[in-house]
A protein has these predicted regions:
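Short, solvent-exposed beta-strand edge segments and adjacent coil->beta transition regions
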Residues: 3-7, 66-70
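Short secondary-structure junctions
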Residues: 27-32, 94-97
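Vicinal oxygen chelate
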Residues: 15-16, 71-101
Length: 101
């Protein structure tokens, strides 16, 4: 089976803050952008941050209040460990720290 890249657009309230978080703290390469949106290479997929309102609620999973909407990437063990340690070292305030299910 061939995995095909996906496009995911999410709302943000500040493009510069999104650029700092996704680009600098998470290390995603910035692609195209405009005044109201910016896209990033999310492990070969396209993550686009658009200025817009967010609707948020949570659902209990593994005893944690998991925000909805949310998204993630499935990594092998070594990639997960490396990425997890990298983002933990960037002083990010997590809603839920990276963990394995």
């Amino acid at each position: 089976m061939i995995l095909r890249p996906f496009h995911l657009a999410i709302p943000v309230d500040d493009i510069e803050a999104a650029k700092e978080f996704y680009g600098l703290k998470l290390g995603f390469v910035e692609g195209r952008s405009d005044d109201h949106w910016i896209d990033f290479n999310f492990f070969g997929h396209q993550l686009v941050c658009h200025i817009g309102e967010s609707i948020s609620f949570s659902n209990e999973v593994d005893g944690k209040d998991v925000p909805i909407p949310h998204f993630g990437i499935v990594l092998d063990w070594k990639e997960f460990d490396i990425f997890s340690e990298t983002i933990k070292s960037n002083n990010i305030d997590f809603i839920i720290e990276p963990y394995l299910r």
